[in-house]
Amino acid sequence: MPKITESNLIAGVQIVEPSMHGDERGFFIETYRREWFPLGREMIQGNRGDRKAGAIVGLHYHLHQADYWYVPYGTCRVVLHDLRTGSPSDGVTQTIDLGARPDGTHDHRGIFIPPGVAHGFASLTDMTITYLVDNYYNPNDELGVAYDDPAIGADWG
């Protein structure tokens, strides 16, 4: 069973540390399971993005879509900013590094991002990100905030 913790900065953001099983042949890891998020909605689409080191993607947000991100290769810095009026963490910014660590290990954490939380990432190395979403693409629910907005004050690495 994975260890799932709620962010201590942004309400509703959940960080998953999945269990890993392996031997000299390699390893197996379950990166997502619906039952881990009993209050979440069903993820209906999976996507993959490959980025070169130095790329910045975001910030964007959705009013009607949650995301679940996992980085199987490389390292990224995830930047989150709570835009939900009335949320206990409204206006809070958080950064989380996912993927490979400087010591050569890989943390294998995933992150659940609820609707209304702006999200983006900087590729600290060449990387791959997979993301599951609970709604199909809707251009009317693709909203954005400038990645360098001083009110957000994000550290992109």
Model-predicted segments: where are they?
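Conserved SET/PR-domain catalytic core that frames the SAM/AdoMet-binding pocket
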Residues: 105-125
